[in-house]
Amino acid sequence: MIAKDSIETAYSFLHQKQRIYVHSTLDWQKDDIELAISDYANDMSQELYDAISGGRADFLRDHKRFQEDITKAVEILEKML
């Protein structure tokens, strides 16, 4: 079972970064956010990662799909709250 505080922490962090990412016009800032989220995903509980990733090993780690992935992750986490 996924701990409620793990869901809340992940939601807060990803939601904040997603809002900045979507509105940013700075490539370096977007790259920094992608790196921070990728690192966070690496350290996230495997059970929580599996719940939001849909089985994709590169979820939140693929530059080309990052905006789509982080938006999906925030939506899923919000429903889990």
Segments and roles (model prediction):
Residues 14-21, 40, 47, 77:
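Non-transmembrane amphipathic alpha-helical segments
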Residues 1-2, 9-15, 40, 58-61, ...:
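Generic detector of bulky aromatic hydrophobic side chains
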Residues 2-34:
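N-terminal acidic leader/helix
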Residues 8-11, 34-41, 67, 71-74:
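Generic structural concept
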Residues 26-65:
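Acidic, low-complexity, intrinsically disordered interaction modules
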Residues 17, 55-81:
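Amphipathic alpha-helical binding modules
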